[in-house]
C-alpha cells in the first residue's frame, strides 16, 4: 500500500480514537443531530451563523454535515459544515456564541482570505478543531492557547505564518497538523511544541521551519506514531534521540538538507514507512533496514548514498513492498541483492548511473511487482526484446532518459500494463500498432522521441483504452489521427501535424485537455471549445474567427490561440466561462474594442491581447474604473488603443495590489498531470517586452503581476494609482504618447524589476524614489522630454546610457553630460558595460511571466475517474514522486 494510503488510514484511526476519547461527555447527554434538541437561543445563533455566508455549495444530503445539540441542555456541542460556506469569517460571527461547543469542523470552506479571528479563544471547551484548506492567512492568534481542552487541531493547507507559539498550554493535543502553510523560524529546544507529550500525530511538513539540526527534544515526544517534517529547511544531522520514538510507525524527513549517515531507526521496530528522500545523506545503507519486521515503505532516493547494497538472506521474509533507491551513487552490482526482496510491488531505481547495462531478466524473481522505474539507467537493449522476461504483473513501467533507440517489444508480454513512460529517448520510426491493443493501457508518455507517425490507419487509436496520451516534441506529421473514444488528456505539442483539426475532436466528450500548439494546423478552430478545461492551439496557421459558442457555466479554464491568423471579434459568450483563468489571443488579426465585460469573470488572472487590431479607449464608458478582481497579467501591446487613463484606472485591481513574500508564492504550471514525482507539463506561453527584450515566457510566481501597454496610442498622464499595484514586477508603457510627469507613486512598486517608459512625451524630472527600488534590474526612459539630474542609486547608475538618451535636459551618470557644466566621466569601461548587459540577459529568465495551475485542480474530475479504476498500490505513490 502506498505512503498516501497509509497516512490517510492512520489519520482516520487516530481521529476516531480522538473523537472517542474526547467525547466522553456524550455518555450522559448524547447529542442529537438536527436542531430539534437545540435551545431557542442556539437555534437563532446557528441561523445567524449560516446567514453570514453563501451556502449554495452545501450538500444537504451529506449526513456528516449538520449541528448536534445536547439533549438535556440544548447547547450546540458539535458543528460540522465542511465544503459548505463562502464568505468572510468575521470576528463578530455568531459562531462565537456557542460556548459549549466541543467539536468544530470547518475544513474545505471557501472563506475569503483573512486572518483567523482571535475570538476562537472564547470557545475554550473545544476538543476537536478542523480548519484546514480554508484560505486563512497571517498568524494564528495567541488566544488559541486558551483552548486547553483541544486534542485534535488541523490547520493544514492555509496561508498561515509566524511561529508555533500558539500551541502553548495545549498539552492534551494528540493530533497536530499545520502542514502546507508558511510557518517559519527556528525550532528551539525550549519551543512549546516539545511540551506536548501526548502527541501521537505531528505534521509540520511543507513550511519554512529551519534549524541547524533537528532538535534533540523531538526524542521527548515518545508517544509519537507519525512524525512529518518534510519540505522544510532543516539541515545538519538527524539526532540520535530519534531512536527514542519507539511507537513510531511513520517517519517523513524528505526535502530538507539533512546530512551525515542515515538516522538510527533500527530500534523503531513498529516502523512501517521511512521516507528520507531528497536530502544529503551519505554513507552506506545498513543491511538491517531490509529486515525490519514491519517496514513496508522505504524511500532513500535523491541522496548521496554510496557503496554496495547488501540484502541479508533473511530478507526473504521482508515485508518491504515499496523501495526507492534512485538518484544515489551506489557501486557494484545492485540489482542482484534487490532481487531477494521478493514481496516488492514498487521499485524505483532511476538515475543510478550504473557502470553496466541493466538486464530486465534480473527482476524475474519479483512476482508481485506492479511498478518499475529504471529511468536514466543504461538498459540492455537485448532485454527489451520479445525474447526477454519481465514480471507479467507489471502495471507501470518507466524507462525515461534511457537512450533507447528501438521500441521495446517486451511490452507485448505485459497484459496488465496501464502506464508506460518512454519519454526523452531516441526511438524513431512509427509507433507500433500492437501497443494500442494492450487491454488495460491507460497512460502513454512517449514525448521527446523521434517518432514520425503511427502504424495502421487513422482510426488505429479510436478503440484503445488510453485516457492520457502525450506525444509532445516528436517528428509526427501529416493529418492528426482520430483520438481514442476514452481520451481525457491529449498533447501533440511541437510536432509537424498539418491540415484541419478533425471535427471528431468534438465527439470526444471526456476530452478535457487538448494541446495542439506549435504545429502547422490550418482551417478553423473546431466549433466545440466549450468542451474543454484546457485548450491550447498556439502557433499554428488557423484561420477564421474564434467560435462564439460558450454556454453558461462552460468549464473552460485556459484558452490559448495566440500566433495564428484569426480575425473577427472576441467572442461575447466568453463571459459565460466563469472559471476562465487564462486567455491569450495574441498575434492574430482580431479587430475589436477592449473586452470590458471580462472584468465580470471572477477568476481571470491572465489576459493577453498583444499584436492584434484592438482599438478604442481603455476606460470603460459609464462603468467606473477598469477593475479585475484577480487579474495579474494584462498584455495589450501592439494594438491601436487610444485615449487617456483616468486617475482611478488602477484602483480596483485587487490581486495586483496584493504582494507576498517570494516563498509564499507558488510557481503554478498550467496543464500538469501529476504522477507522483512524474509530471507531464504543457506550459502556457506569452510574449512579453520584459527587461528590454522580446521573449517567450512560460511561468510566473503567482504572487507577481505584469502590465504591458506598449505600442499603442495612449495619451494623457500616467495615473498615480499605478503605485497601488504592489505586486508588479514588470511595467511597460513605452511607445505611446503619455505626457506629464513620471508618477511619484512608482516608488511604491517595491517588487518591480523592469520599468520601460521610453518613447513617450514625459516631462519633468525622474523621481528620486525610483533610485531606491532595490529589485529594479532594467529601466528605460529614453526618448522623452525629461530634464534634471538622473537620481543616483545602484539600480539606476548601473543601467546603460541608452536607457536615458533622447532627453535633451537629462544630465548625470550614466550619461556623460554633467549637471555642473562639464562632461561627466564615462559611467563605466565599455568592456564592463558589455559584460553587464550580458549578465543582464542571463538573469532575464530567472522568473518567467505566464501562469498555470496543476491539473490536480484543473482536471480533478477527469483524473479522479481515471484514478478510481487504477490499483492504488502503485498509482498513489506516483503522485508522490519527484520530477525528472
Swiss-Prot record:
Domain of life: Eukaryota
Signal sequence range: 1-24
Broad class of where this protein is predominantly found: membrane
Transmembrane segments: 848-868
Keywords per UniProt: Cell membrane, Glycoprotein, Leucine-rich repeat, Membrane, Receptor, Repeat, Signal, Transmembrane, Transmembrane helix
Residue ranges, Extracellular side: 25-847
Stored Gene3D superfamilies: Ribonuclease Inhibitor
Membrane topology value: Single-pass type I membrane protein
Residue stretches of each LRR repeat: 98-122, 124-146, 147-170, 171-196, 197-223, 225-245, 246-268, 269-292, 294-318, 320-344, 345-365, 366-391, 392-413, 414-438, 440-463, 464-487, 488-507, 508-529, 530-553, 554-577, 579-601, 602-625, 628-652, 702-725, 726-749, 750-773, 775-798
Glycan-linked positions: 59, 71, 92, 146, 190, 208, 244, 267, 304, 313, 353, 403, 463, 520, 576, 732, 780
Entry's Gene Ontology cellular component terms: plasma membrane
Protein name (database record): Receptor-like protein 39
Source organism per UniProt: Arabidopsis thaliana
Amino acid at each position: 500500500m502506498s505512503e498516501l494510503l497509509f497516512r490517510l488510514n492512520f489519520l482516520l484511526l487516530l481521529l476516531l480514537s480522538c473523537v472517542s476519547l474526547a467525547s466522553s461527555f456524550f455518555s450522559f447527554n448524547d447529542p442529537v443531530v438536527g436542531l430539534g434538541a437545540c435551545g431557542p437561543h442556539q437555534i437563532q445563533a446557528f441561523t445567524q451563523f449560516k446567514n453570514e455566508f453563501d451556502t449554495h455549495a452545501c450538500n444537504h444530503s451529506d449526513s456528516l454535515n449538520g449541528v448536534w445539540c445536547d439533549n438535556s441542555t440544548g447547547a450546540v456541542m458539535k458543528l460540522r459544515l465542511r465544503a459548505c460556506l463562502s464568505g468572510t469569517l468575521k470576528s463578530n460571527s455568531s459562531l462565537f456564541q456557542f460556548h459549549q461547543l466541543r467539536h468544530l469542523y470547518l475544513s474545505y470552506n471557501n472563506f475569503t482570505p483573512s486572518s483567523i479571528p482571535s475570538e476562537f479563544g472564547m470557545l475554550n471547551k473545544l476538543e476537536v478543531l478542523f480548519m484546514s484548506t480554508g484560505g486563512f492567512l497571517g498568524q494564528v492568534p495567541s488566544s488559541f492557547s486558551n483552548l486547553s481542552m483541544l486534542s485534535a487541531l488541523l490547520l493544514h493547507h492555509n496561508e498561515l505564518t509566524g511561529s508555533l507559539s500558539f500551541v502553548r498550554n495545549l498539552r492534551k493535543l494528540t493530533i497536530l497538523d499545520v502542514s502546507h502553510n508558511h510557518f517559519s523560524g527556528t525550532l528551539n529546544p525550549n519551543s512549546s511544541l516539545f511540551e506536548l507529550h501526548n502527541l501521537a500525530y505531528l505534521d509540520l511538513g511543507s513550511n519554512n521551519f529551519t534549524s541547524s539540526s533537528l532538535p534533540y527534544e523531538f526524542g521527548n515526544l515518545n508517544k509519537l506514531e507519525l512524525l512529518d517534517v518534510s519540505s522544510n529547511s532543516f539541515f545538519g544531522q538527524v539526532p540520535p534521540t530519534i531512536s527514542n520514538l519507539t511507537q513510531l510507525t511513520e517517519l517523513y524527513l524528505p526535502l530538507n538538507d539533512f546530512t551525515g549517515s542515515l538516522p538510527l531507526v533500527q530500534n523503531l521496530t513498529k516502523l512501517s514507512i521511512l521516507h528520507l528522500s531528497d536530502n544529503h545523506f551519505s554513507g552506506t545503507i545498513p543491511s538491517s533496514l531490509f529486515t525490519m519486521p514491519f517496514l513496508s515503505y522505504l524511500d532513500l532516493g535523491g541522496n548521496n548514498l554510496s557503496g554496495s547494497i547488501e540484502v541479508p538472506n533473511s530478507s526473504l521474509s521482508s515485508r518491504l513492498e515499496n523501495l526507492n533507491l534512485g538518484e544515489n551513487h551506489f557501486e557494484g552490482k545492485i540489482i542482484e541483492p534487490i532481487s531477494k526482496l521478493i514481496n516488492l510491488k514498487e521499485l524505483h531505481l532511476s538515475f543510478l548511473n550504473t557502470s553496466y547495462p541493466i538486464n530486465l531478466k534480473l527482476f524475474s524473481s519479483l512476482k508481485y511487482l506492479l511498478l518499475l522505474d529504471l529511468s536514466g539507467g543504461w538498459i540492455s537493449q537485448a532485454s527489451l526484446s520479445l525474447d526477454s522476461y519481465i514480471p507479467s504483473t507489471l502495471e507501470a513501467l518507466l524507462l525515461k532518459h534511457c537512450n533507447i533507440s528501438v521500441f521495446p517489444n517486451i511490452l507485448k508480454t505485459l497484459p496488465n500494463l496501464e502506464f508506460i513512460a518512454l519519454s526523452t529517448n531516441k526511438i524513431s520510426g512509427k509507433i507500433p500498432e500492437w501497443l494500442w491493443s494492450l487491454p488495460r493501457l491507460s497512460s502513454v508518455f512517449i514525448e521527446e522521441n523521434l517518432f514520425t507517425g503511427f502504424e495502421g490507419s487513422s482510426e488505429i487509436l479510436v478503440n484503445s483504452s488510453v485516457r492520457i496520451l502525450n506525444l509532445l516534441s516528436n517528428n509526427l506529421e501529416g493529418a492528426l489521427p482520430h483520438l481514442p473514444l476514452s481520451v481525457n488528456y491529449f498533447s501533440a505539442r511541437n510536432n509537424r501535424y498539418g491540415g484541419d483539426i478533425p471535427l471528431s475532436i468534438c465527439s470526444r466528450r471526456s476530452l478535457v485537455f487538448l494541446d495542439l500548439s506549435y504545429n502547422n494546423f490550418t482551417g478553423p478552430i473546431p466549433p466545440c471549445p466549450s468542451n474543454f478545461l484546457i485548450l491550447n492551439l498556439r502557433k499554428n496557421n488557423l484561420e477564421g474567427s474564434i467560435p462564439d459558442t460558450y454556454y453558461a457555466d462552460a468549464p473552460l479554464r485556459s484558452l490559448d490561440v495566440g500566433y495564428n491568423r484569426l480575425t473577427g471579434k472576441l467572442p461575447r459568450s466568453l463571459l459565460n466561462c466563469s472559471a476562465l483563468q487564462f486567455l491569450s489571443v495574441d498575434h492574430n488579426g482580431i479587430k475589436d474594442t477592449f473586452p470590458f465585460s471580462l472584468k465580470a469573470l471572477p477568476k481571470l488572472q491572465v489576459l493577453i491581447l498583444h499584436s492584434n487590431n484592438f482599438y478604442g479607449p481603455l476606460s470603460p464608458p459609464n462603468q467606473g474604473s477598469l477593475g479585475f478582481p484577480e487579474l495579474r497579467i494584462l498584455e495589450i501591446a501592439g494594438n491601436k488603443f487610444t485615449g487617456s487613463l483616468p486617475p482611478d484606472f488602477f484602483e480596483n485591481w485587487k490581486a495586483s495590489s496584493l504582494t507576498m513574500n517570494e516563498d509564499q508564492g507558488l510557481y503554478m504550471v498550467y496543464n500538469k498531470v501529476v504522477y507522483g514525482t512524474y509530471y507531464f507539463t504543457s506550459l502556457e506561453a506569452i510574449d512579453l517586452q520584459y527587461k528590454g527584450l522580446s521573449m517567450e515566457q512560460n511561468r510566473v510566481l503567482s504572487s507577481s503581476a505584469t502590465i504591458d501597454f506598449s505600442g499603442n496610442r495612449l495619451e494623457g498622464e500616467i495615473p498615480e494609482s499605478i503605485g497601488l499595484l504592489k505586486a508588479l514586477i514588470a511595467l511597460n508603457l513605452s511607445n505611446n504618447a503619455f505626457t506629464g510627469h513620471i508618477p511619484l507613486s512608482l516608488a511604491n512598486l517595491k517588487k518591480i524589476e523592469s520599468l520601460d517608459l521610453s518613447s513617450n512625451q514625459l516631462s519633468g524630472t525622474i523621481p528620486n524614489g525610483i533610485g531606491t527600488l532595490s529589485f529594479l534590474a532594467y529601466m528605460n526612459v529614453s526618448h522623452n522630454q525629461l530634464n534634471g539630474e538622473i537620481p543616483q542609486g545602484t539600480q539606476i547608475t548601473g543601467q546603460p546610457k541608452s536607457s536615458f538618451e533622447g532627453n535633451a535636459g537629462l544630465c548625470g551618470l550614466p550619461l556623460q553630460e554633467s549637471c555642473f557644466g562639464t562632461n561627466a566621466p564615462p559611467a563605466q569601461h565599455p568592456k564592463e558595460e558589455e559584460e553587464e548587459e550580458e549578465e543582464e540577459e542571463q538573469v532575464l529568465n530567472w522568473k518567467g511571466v505566464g501562469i498555470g495551475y496543476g491539473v490536480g485542480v484543473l482536471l480533478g474530475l477527469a483524473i479522479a475517474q481515471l484514478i478510481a479504476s487504477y490499483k492504488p498500490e502503485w498509482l498513489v505513490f506516483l503522485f508522490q514522486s519527484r520530477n525528472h
